[in-house]
């Protein structure tokens, strides 16, 4: 259907539209008109992706000079594939309506691991190994050697792409990862570099967060993208953690020992080259005097190690004299390594700021701040000069150099914590240095400054106002949308007591209480008797899940649950969890029914949708607070309090509630789906917790369902499931939660749509 969204003609590839989709498009258009940033919370399963794509594509066509590109960032490969399929549907609808092929290019980009087609590289399991092997086949000096001697190993796909692929752009159309690989095999071109080259002239690019937020990768991949692009971060409720992880470095004793070995290898290589080819080292010295920008004007294949965060002015400077020659630089790294090793020999926890660390470094081993800033780039230049083909071996030393560059670049927003042992095993010495980023805005700031519109969107962003604070930006639109339903298909409830009236909670004091554990077991047992097909239960941590399940086993509760449904458990091993998920789905398909016990913040809670019968009930055992004794977390809370005036308790509750909402939101993946959302902890009933749930869940959480016993909860569930079992046809939704074009244009509907979005 063709829609008129605030004067913009939008092609929508379906015959019907949800009211919230139209409302969402209106907000999006306002954001794009204002050329600003937006934060939008849209209920899960209401067609967020297609609304985004349809509106932004229409905007691109109407104002080609205003918006040149859409950069769509998603978290996992399956999500990226989903977005590409929606885009394909949308483009074919456009072509059907217009009767001609559009000059439109949309593509997905992922790591070499998902795109490489070289027979020697594809069998490797880990991304790091794939990148290293790729570099050893495509580095410019490896290719130069191949030109001289064609018997040497090389990558024929890259050579072919380099000769022909750059002249012939990708034909217009939509490409997912498999399509790119198919083109690569057909033409004999490397799909990874083809995709990286093509994103410059694509209309829509879909890739992972890291390509924009991790400075080491963004510098290589996204540097050339134009300012007039719209960036969308989908499923962005965790975006602050992604930003923080991309800027933090952990150094253990094992890493430092491997650094030592790396340095010795480099020392030998330098001596060998000095004897055979001294000209090469002189050439590098000359380049470094001219400035790093010249030194790093290397080819795309060599840019395997990007610098973590160097501002432009540093790249234009000459490298300090003290680290220009290879021997001096290696001596410099050795002194730095010895100092960090010495710091790890502490007997108690140390916390200090980067300037304090630097002053200690200057006093002890006479290392100044300036050469440290060049460390990462200088190492990159050295590895390039020495023609080191297997870069993965040097990742420990690269990590140390990145740490040196970061610690000398940022005086604020970071802390250094040195722990002599893990709190959980205080008798085992296991020292670790955390260089921890506390300010999420540091990684995302360049994105906000560079692109004219950045949209942060997800099903669980409540409370909205905290995101602009912790990411330090000023949105032009902030809105949360409700879910218009012809029948109420979600049933949230808070179970706060067992049948014996004992308050149930996962808080630390009552965690080991046998009565609480028994009541949790009874809740699962009774729910498994009334809920059809699949139940997903989330615990607050792996440790808590293990101790609870062990206790249920001793009390015989597990045996009773097994009579109703089969049990599957998520573990920390990814492969094991995948098998458990597969079997869980099989049990639901076969009508045996299944329960999946998993962990908030784990793999299951983030990326897996339990559509229809795979998730008829989600039970959240406890409030999923993060481990509050962690020193890194304490330092971050202190920073948030001092810099952004966010109280510790507010942030912890916000963090717990967004994860709880993310977990229970897995059950509802569309308006024809239905499910129970059980919050099993009396603390959820408090106003400060309840008020931080997304608006679309809060609306259906009635006062009657706030502090139920297990029995009462089961009665509510029975009644709800009986209602849901009644036949439900598309006709029942028409005019209410599903609109045709005529209905959408009526004044009454438009008035209703205005109430869906709640602006903040």
UniProtKB/Swiss-Prot annotation:
One of its GO terms (cellular component) is nucleus. It catalyses: Couples ATP hydrolysis with the unwinding of duplex DNA at the replication fork by translocating in the 5'-3' direction. This creates two antiparallel DNA single strands (ssDNA). The leading ssDNA polymer is the template for DNA polymerase III holoenzyme which synthesizes a continuous strand; ATP + H2O = ADP + phosphate + H(+). This is General transcription and DNA repair factor IIH helicase subunit XPD. PANTHER family: DNA REPAIR DEAD HELICASE RAD3/XP-D SUBFAMILY MEMBER, GENERAL TRANSCRIPTION AND DNA REPAIR FACTOR IIH HELICASE SUBUNIT XPD. Keywords: 4Fe-4S, ATP-binding, Chromosome partition, Cytoplasm, Cytoskeleton, DNA damage, DNA repair, DNA-binding, Helicase, Hydrolase, Iron, Iron-sulfur, Isomerase, Magnesium, Metal-binding, Nucleotide-binding, Nucleus, Transcription, Transcription regulation, Ubl conjugation. It is found in: Nucleus; Cytoplasm, Cytoskeleton, Spindle. ATP-dependent 5'-3' DNA helicase, component of the general transcription and DNA repair factor IIH (TFIIH) core complex, which is involved in general and transcription-coupled nucleotide excision repair (NER) of damaged DNA and, when complexed to CDK-activating kinase (CAK), involved in transcription by RNA polymerase II. In NER, TFIIH acts by opening DNA around the lesion to allow the excision of the damaged oligonucleotide and its replacement by a new DNA fragment. The ATP-dependent helicase activity of XPD/ERCC2 is required for DNA opening. [4Fe-4S] cluster binds at residues 116, 134, 155, 190. InterPro entries: ATP-dep_Helicase_C (IPR006555), DinG/Rad3-like (IPR045028), DNA/RNA_helicase_DEAH_CS (IPR002464), HBB (IPR010643), Helic_SF1/SF2_ATP-bd_DinG/Rad3 (IPR014013), Helicase-like_DEXD_c2 (IPR006554), P-loop_NTPase (IPR027417), RAD3-like_helicase_DEAD (IPR010614). The lineage of its organism: Eukaryota, Metazoa, Chordata, Craniata, Vertebrata. A motif (DEAH box) lies at residues 234-237. ATP binds at residues 42-49. A motif (Nuclear localization signal) lies at residues 682-695. Belongs to the helicase family. RAD3/XPD subfamily. The gene is ERCC2. Component of the 7-subunit TFIIH core complex composed of XPB/ERCC3, XPD/ERCC2, GTF2H1, GTF2H2, GTF2H3, GTF2H4 and GTF2H5, which is active in NER. The core complex associates with the 3-subunit CDK-activating kinase (CAK) module composed of CCNH/cyclin H, CDK7 and MNAT1 to form the 10-subunit holoenzyme (holo-TFIIH) active in transcription. The interaction with GTF2H2 results in the stimulation of the 5'-->3' helicase activity. Component of the MMXD complex, which includes CIAO1, ERCC2, CIAO2B, MMS19 and SLC25A5. Interacts with CIAO1 and CIAO2B; the interaction WITH CIAO2B is direct. GO terms for biological process: chromosome segregation; hair cell differentiation; nucleotide-excision repair; positive regulation of mitotic recombination; regulation of mitotic cell cycle phase transition; response to oxidative stress; transcription by RNA polymerase II; transcription initiation at RNA polymerase II promoter. It comes from the Eukaryota. Binds 1 [4Fe-4S] cluster. Its main location: nucleus. One of its GO terms (molecular function) is ATP binding. Its cofactor is Mg(2+); [4Fe-4S] cluster. The keyword Glycoprotein does not apply. Residues 7-283 form the Helicase ATP-binding domain.
């Amino acid at each position: 259907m063709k829609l008129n969204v605030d004067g913009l003609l939008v092609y929508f590839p379906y015959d019907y539209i949800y009211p919230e989709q139209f409302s969402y498009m209106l907000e999006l258009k306002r954001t794009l008109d204002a050329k600003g940033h937006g934060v939008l919370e849209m209920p899960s399963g209401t067609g967020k992706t297609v609304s985004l794509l349809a509106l932004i594509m229409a905007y691109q066509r109407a104002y080609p000079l205003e918006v040149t590109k859409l950069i769509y960032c998603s978290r996992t490969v399956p999500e990226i594939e989903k977005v590409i399929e929606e885009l394909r549907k949308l483009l074919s609808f456009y072509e059907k309506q217009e009767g001609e092929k559009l000059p439109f290019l949309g593509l997905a980009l992922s790591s070499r691991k998902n795109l490489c087609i070289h027979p020697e590289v594809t069998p490797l399991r880990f991304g790091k190994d794939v990148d290293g092997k790729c570099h050893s086949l495509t580095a410019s000096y490896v290719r130069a050697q191949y030109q001289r001697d064609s018997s040497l190993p090389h990558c024929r796909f890259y050579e072919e792409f380099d000769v022909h692929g750059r002249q012939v752009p990708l034909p217009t159309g939509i490409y997912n990862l498999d399509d790119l690989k198919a083109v690569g095999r057909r033409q004999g071109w490397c799909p990874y570099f083809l995709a990286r080259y093509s994103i410059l002239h694509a209309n829509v690019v879909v890739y992972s967060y890291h390509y924009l937020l991790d400075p080491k990768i963004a510098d290589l991949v996204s540097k050339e993208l134009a300012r007039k692009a719209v960036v969308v971060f989908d499923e962005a409720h965790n975006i602050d953690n992604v930003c923080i992880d991309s800027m933090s470095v952990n150094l253990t004793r094992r890493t430092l020992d491997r650094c030592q070995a790396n340095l010795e290898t480099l020392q030998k290589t330098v001596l060998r080259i000095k004897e055979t080819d001294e000209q090469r080292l002189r050439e590098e010295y000359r380049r470094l005097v001219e400035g790093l920008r010249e030194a790093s004007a290397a080819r795309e294949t060599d840019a395997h190690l990007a610098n973590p965060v160097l501002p432009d002015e540093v790249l234009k400077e000459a490298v300090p004299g003290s680290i220009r020659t290879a021997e001096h630089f290696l001596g410099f790294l050795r002194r730095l390594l010895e100092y960090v090793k010495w710091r790890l020999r502490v007997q108690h926890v140390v916390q200090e700021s980067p300037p304090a660390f630097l002053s200690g470094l200057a006093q002890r081993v006479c290392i100044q701040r300036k050469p440290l800033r060049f460390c990462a780039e200088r190492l990159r230049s050295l590895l390039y000069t020495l023609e080191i083909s297997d870069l993965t071996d040097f990742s420990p030393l690269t990590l140390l150099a990145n740490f040196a560059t970061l610690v000398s670049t940022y005086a604020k927003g970071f802390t250094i914590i040195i722990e002599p042992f893990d709190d959980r095993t205080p008798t085992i010495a296991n020292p670790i240095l955390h260089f921890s980023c506390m300010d999420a805005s540091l990684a995302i700031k360049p994105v906000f400054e560079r692109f004219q519109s950045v949209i942060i969107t997800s099903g669980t962003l409540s409370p909205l106002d905290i995101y602009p604070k912790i990411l330090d930006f000023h949105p032009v639109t902030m809105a949360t949308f409700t879910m218009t339903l012809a029948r109420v298909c979600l049933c949230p409830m808070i179970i706060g007591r067992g049948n014996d009236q004992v308050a149930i909670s996962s808080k630390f004091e009552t965690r080991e209480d046998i009565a609480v554990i028994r009541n949790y077991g009874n809740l699962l047992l009774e729910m498994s008797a009334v809920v059809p097909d699949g139940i997903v239960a989330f615990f607050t941590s792996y440790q808590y899940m293990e101790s609870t399940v062990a206790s249920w086993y001793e009390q015989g509760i597990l045996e009773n649950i097994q009579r109703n449904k089969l049990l599957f458990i998520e573990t920390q091993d990814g492969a094991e969890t995948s098998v458990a998920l597969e079997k869980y789905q099989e049990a639901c398909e076969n009508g045996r029914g299944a329960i999946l016990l998993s962990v908030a913040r784990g793999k299951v809670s983030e990326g897996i949708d339990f559509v229809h019968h795979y998730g008829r009930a989600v039970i959240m055992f406890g409030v999923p607070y993060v481990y509050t004794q962690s020193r890194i977390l304490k330092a971050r809370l202190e920073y948030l309090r001092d810099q952004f005036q966010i109280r510790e308790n507010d942030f912890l509750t916000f963090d717990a509630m967004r994860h709880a909402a993310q977990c229970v939101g897995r059950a509802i993946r569309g308006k024809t789906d239905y499910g129970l959302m059980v919050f099993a902890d009396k603390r959820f009933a408090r106003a400060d917790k309840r008020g931080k749930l997304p608006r679309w869940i809060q609306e259906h959480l009635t006062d009657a369902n706030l502090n139920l016993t297990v029995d009462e909860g089961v009665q509510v569930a029975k009644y709800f499931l009986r209602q849901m079992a009644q036949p439900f046809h598309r006709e029942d939704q028409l005019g209410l939660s599903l609109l045709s074009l005529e209905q959408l244009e009526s004044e009454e509907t438009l008035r209703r749509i205005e109430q869906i979005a709640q602006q903040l």
